């Protein structure tokens, strides 16, 4: 090392005399070498110049091609503006016409100030810190049923949330989910057919991984659709087979569209493996009726495709009298015969409904008609991830087994649940009515879920300008909305839409106190935008 460093020093003589103290000597020529002389010890550091192993061109191109609009360009820009607002606040300046970003891009209730359910948080706090149960004041702070539930849960997990559970999930929670499904549907549910997951998304990803070998395997997805599906299909190198929902008929699902998409795929040599149904719809907010669901089940059996039932919004139904939520599990079992054994996977989550615990990442999937050898492969996929997070599993348990009549926490739980539900229903109507009052905008009622998906008829000049700068017209509209109002929504082009139409998706999750202001800001911006491009 000494000889090598000395050679470098001689080939790059210093300009100034070297002092005994540490001195950095810059070489005369423009080389990659810097020599440091420290107390007469010569060492050498060379800047390594080598070709990078990972480049944007040689990484998996499916990753590059996958798009997830819900957290795409608009959200990245919104976060940048949020930092700017924080800086403004610190410096006492004001350069933007708004004071905060309103994130209406994603169904994330607690981000927009929905309060968590008291019972859930009380139980989780005791489970996370079991020493509290030994505190002499615990019974004065926590209701008796909360203490009892926490002890029951702790007994099922060896008194700690810090250990891995079984890859399929905690036995206590699996049994609770099965009991919930039986109460809901009136049909038997087997805990061994249930897998707990980190939110419904992980379950969806695992099943799609199981189904897709290559581009010759296709998945039928609704258009518009939740981009989890399109992104995951692309990641796994499958083919997206879109079927159009009918906007003119309240985003209805027509079997003729399924037939068209199926036949088109087969003609191209693609094998449709599964049909995705999102009920209630995301981003469209429609609810299916039983007759339509039975048609879908018949289609799946006839075509031999797996039914993937995304039912995470089953508690978000605002037309319960005319279109109550019915699970596909109930439909196939009620139909009986071969239909009862239809290959199907149903998904549910703690992120939606009135629970809104998105950050806890809890969910489950139930298998129906799946063979034991295939189920073993699903278990293998779960095992590769070790286990779902334990707190998420416990929140699933609380969701499917809340306090019952006679328990101390029951009345407060009902009050909080009903207040959230009624408020969501009110906000859904308020937002859709406000959107329908805008020039060139039509919006179907939000029968369920957490979103409105209005169609916006943009002036020709706006469309031309957006195209000239390489933006989808609805994306350009949404960017301008964000820049002018601080309201972050998602362009319809991120979900898929009928050619020649433009939409955006917005949640109605801002609080009742805030939603009217959001509606007014959208209305003011929209009128200004339309006037500018007329």
From Swiss-Prot:
Family matches, as Gene3D superfamilies: 1.10.287.1970, Aspartate Aminotransferase, domain 1, Type I PLP-dependent aspartate aminotransferase-like (Major domain)
Chief localisation class: mitochondrion
GO terms of molecular function: L-alanine:2-oxoglutarate aminotransferase activity; pyridoxal phosphate binding
Pfam families (alphabetical): Aminotran_1_2
EC number(s) reported in the record: 2.6.1.2
N6-(pyridoxal phosphate)lysine: residues carrying this PTM: 352
EC class (word): transferase
Reaction catalyzed: L-alanine + 2-oxoglutarate = pyruvate + L-glutamate
Localization per Swiss-Prot or TrEMBL: Mitochondrion matrix
Organelle transit peptide: 1-18
Pathway as given in its UniProt record: Amino-acid degradation; L-alanine degradation via transaminase pathway; pyruvate from L-alanine: step 1/1
Cofactor(s) needed for function: pyridoxal 5'-phosphate
CDD domains: AAT_like
Keyword Repressor recorded: no
Superkingdom: Eukaryota
Keywords assigned by UniProt, alphabetized: Aminotransferase, Mitochondrion, Pyridoxal phosphate, Transferase, Transit peptide
Listed GO biological process terms: biosynthetic process; L-alanine catabolic process
Listed GO CC annotations: mitochondrial matrix
Database matches in InterPro entries: ALAT1/2-like (IPR045088), Aminotransferase_I/II_large (IPR004839), PyrdxlP-dep_Trfase (IPR015424), PyrdxlP-dep_Trfase_major (IPR015421), PyrdxlP-dep_Trfase_small (IPR015422)
Assigned protein family: Belongs to the class-I pyridoxal-phosphate-dependent aminotransferase family. Alanine aminotransferase subfamily.
PANTHER family assigned to the protein according to its UniProt record, in alphabetical order: ALANINE AMINOTRANSFERASE (PTHR11751), ALANINE TRANSAMINASE (PTHR11751:SF29)
Subunit annotation: Homodimer.
Protein name according to UniProt: Probable alanine aminotransferase, mitochondrial
